[in-house]
């Protein structure tokens, strides 16, 4: 049975040539899938695909089901690696990471991110808006940048009530309760860093989730998107823990579909309700403007130059909006930490065809944070 899927019709020869040149030092990669083999070779100005050939500098073995998931953008190679559903017979993780953006382009037409192609259409990545702006202006900024900062969406009183409810849920949380994420502090203590499925346990937070202001912003790009309070961790609250921690309080550069599901999750839109303000000292959001809808190297900081980065500092009651495949990070606070953000996400209807309650990747690894954290 043939392994190599047809090349996506959206492939631009110039983009593929530039990507192939970057793979020169990495060399060819072979996939052994049950009894079949396929090898991808950087052959500037393109990539050569050879069925039955197994002489790549990197050799990856996986099952047919895993290969199909990779090609169809249901699971990423990182997901397969963590799940031990792929093994390296030659080469390793770094070589697979080098090939990953190119394979996504060939298989699904998702172009490799290149800062030289960044086009902000004259817009300012640092712009802040209010709800007085019309939907067309807000949508245009979100479409170009992949993120949006809207000030003073909620009042201080509304945020005080929400924070009191977060205090209540935090007091009830325990490691291993399957409704929270925890990290280990420098002193060896466990510290709460995320509450999940919060609106199933709080009418106060459920009201925020369903607030017309949240819906307006979440549906700017696609009015058919839907809330998913009972799956994908529902609406979650991030709590930034200060200092060096082991676990997933400080999340490195990533796309929210980085573990898989791009074909069914994207373009989801995530609303960040700023329960507290955020800045570098408390732990803020960093983004690569205009990186959404593209594939980026897992360690892009080591292999790409000139990548624009924006820090999104906020006040209590502000809202951030980001397309889920935007490249973004939640770095370690430089000071006291303490940022609280409630994330409410709107998904395409295809989600309900594939992922039920408790079936998302995070549901499966929530209590295995040390394993996931080794990718930082």
Could you describe each region identified by the protein language model?
Residues 67-68, 258-259, 325-329:
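Histidine-centered metal-chelating micro-motifs
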Residues 314-328:
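Conserved metal-binding segment of the jelly-roll/cupin
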């Amino acid at each position: 049975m043939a392994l190599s899927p047809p090349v996506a019709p959206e492939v631009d020869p110039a983009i593929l040539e530039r990507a192939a040149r970057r793979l020169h030092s990495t060399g060819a990669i072979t996939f052994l899938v049950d009894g079949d083999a396929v090898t991808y070779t950087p052959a500037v100005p393109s990539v050569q695909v050879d069925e039955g050939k197994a002489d790549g500098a990197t050799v990856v073995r996986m099952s047919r089901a895993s290969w199909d998931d990779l090609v169809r953008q249901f699971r990423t190679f990182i997901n397969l690696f963590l799940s031990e559903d792929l093994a390296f017979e030659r080469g390793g993780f770094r070589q697979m990471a080098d090939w990953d953006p190119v394979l996504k382009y060939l298989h699904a037409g998702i172009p490799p991110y290149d800062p030289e192609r960044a086009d902000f259409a004259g817009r300012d990545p640092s712009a802040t808006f209010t709800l007085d702006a019309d939907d067309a202006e807000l949508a245009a900024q979100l479409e170009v940048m992949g993120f949006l900062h809207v000030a003073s969406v909620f009042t201080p009183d509304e945020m005080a009530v929400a924070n009191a409810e977060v205090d209540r849920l935090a007091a009830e949380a325990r490691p291993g309760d399957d409704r929270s994420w925890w990290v280990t502090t420098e002193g060896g203590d466990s510290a709460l860093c995320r509450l999940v499925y919060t609106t199933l346990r709080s009418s106060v937070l459920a009201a925020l989730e369903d607030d017309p202001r949240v819906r307006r912003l979440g549906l700017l790009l696609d009015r058919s998107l839907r809330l998913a309070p009972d799956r994908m961790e529902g609406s979650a609250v991030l709590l930034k823990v200060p200092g060096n921690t082991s676990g997933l309080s400080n999340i490195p550069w990533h796309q929210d579909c980085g573990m898989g599901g791009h074909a069914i999750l994207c373009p989801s839109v995530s609303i960040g309700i700023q329960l507290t303000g955020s800045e570098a000292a408390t732990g803020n959001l960093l983004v690569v403007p205009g990186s959404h809808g593209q594939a980026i190297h897992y360690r892009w900081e080591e292999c790409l130059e000139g990548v624009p980065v924006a820090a999104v500092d906020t006040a209590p009651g502000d809202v951030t909006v980001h397309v889920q495949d935007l490249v973004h990070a939640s770095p370690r606070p430089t000071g006291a930490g303490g940022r609280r953000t409630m994330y409410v996400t709107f998904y395409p209807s295809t989600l309900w065809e594939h992922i039920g309650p408790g079936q998302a990747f995070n549901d499966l690894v929530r209590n295995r944070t040390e394993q996931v954290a080794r990718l930082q």
